[in-house]
Amino acid sequence: MKVYIIGKVTGLHYQQCCEQFEEAHVKLEERGHKVVNPMRIVPEGTGWIEAMKICLRELIDCEAFYRLPNALTSKGALCELFVATELKLTEIL
């Protein structure tokens, strides 16, 4: 299943975000999923609006999403969660 990782990025240290998303990425791959990791597809330093455009294009092509624990504290992640749930993507627990 193609799974998109949703989590907070803005306001956190770049390296901390990379580590959190990468940990989830590895876990999901080990479970047999094809993973879309925003930290791998959005270049460091990209502005918020452009990053969201990149991420949302990728999200709508996925079948499922995985939510990091910090996702509910992020405007961008909440936007992604809204889109994912409205498109009836499966949440991977």
Residue ranges, per PLM feature:
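Conserved catalytic or regulatory cores that recognize and/or transform ribose-phosphate-containing ligands
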Residues: 1-93
